């Protein structure tokens, strides 16, 4: 459960530019 949430958060962070 937690792993899925962490993966989703990481994907969102990677998709959005972190300038």
Swiss-Prot record:
Keywords: Toxin-antitoxin system. One of its GO terms (biological process) is programmed cell death. It holds the Pfam family Ibs_toxin. It comes from the Bacteria. Disruption phenotype: None seen. An isbE overproducing strain cannot be made in the absence of the sibE gene. Induction: The sibE sRNA probably represses expression of ibsE mRNA, either by destabilizing the transcript and/or preventing its translation. Expression of the proteinaceous toxin is controlled by antisense sRNA SibE. Belongs to the Ibs toxic protein family. Toxic component of a type I toxin-antitoxin (TA) system. Overexpression causes cessation of growth. This is Small toxic protein IbsE. It comes from Escherichia coli (strain K12). The gene is ibsE.
């Amino acid at each position: 459960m937690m792993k899925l949430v962490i993966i989703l958060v990481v994907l969102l962070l990677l998709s959005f530019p972190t300038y």
